[in-house]
């Protein structure tokens, strides 16, 4: 039976989960809540048997989960992709936390009502952050080596969202630019991105000063 996902009809915190499942070729069904479906979600929220009800959620025949990182870790663990030693698992966990910092740092700026005032400071600090990630990636193909892991999709998604605000941000970081292209060129990811199921926009909730609305900036 396919896993069931639930989230808003946006990219948000669910997009890395979608990308990871597509890469793995794992079947899933997704319930998408639209812009005007808040009351519908509130009606569903406490009637699904979720321990800590929230979006996104993931339900399969053995588990009901919320929280995007927990979902990613569970899927990775099912496929034997969480590392084979305490050191490897700790490193993956570290990358997860840093990837969430990258994505949420961008999101907090974009959601702020004073976005136009704050974006200058965000963009000023961005090269330092990207240099850290470029140095960490080094000469590896992917973040933990030569094999794809769930954290690659977390970092990829953050980078892809940031480039809507700063289209040239990776020009000084060719290793990150190549990493981003490498993810997009994975056959199943490329196919997914061409499909009608792929959500390109919005990045955030529809009301977000940046990354919201119905269409990307021109």
Curated annotation (Swiss-Prot):
It comes from the Eukaryota. SUPFAM superfamilies: GST C-terminal domain-like, Thioredoxin-like. Its EC number is 2.5.1.18. It catalyses: RX + glutathione = an S-substituted glutathione + a halide anion + H(+). InterPro entries: Glutathione-S-Trfase_C-like, Glutathione-S-Trfase_C_sf, Glutathione_S-Trfase_N, GST_C, GST_superfamily, Thioredoxin-like_sf. Conjugation of reduced glutathione to a wide number of exogenous and endogenous hydrophobic electrophiles. GST isoenzymes appear to play a central role in the parasite detoxification system. Other functions are also suspected including a role in increasing the solubility of haematin in the parasite gut. Residues 85-203 form the GST C-terminal domain. Substrate binds at residue 111. It is an enzyme of class 2 (transferase). Disulfide bonds: none annotated. Belongs to the GST superfamily. Mu family. Residues 2-83 form the GST N-terminal domain. One of its GO terms (biological process) is glutathione metabolic process. Keywords: Transferase. Transmembrane segments: none annotated. GO terms for molecular function: glutathione transferase activity. Signal peptide: none annotated. CDD domains: GST_C_Mu, GST_N_Mu. Gene3D superfamilies: 1.20.1050.130. This is Glutathione S-transferase class-mu 26 kDa isozyme 7. It comes from Fasciola hepatica. Homodimer. Glutathione binds at residues 7-8, 41-45, 54-55, 67-68.
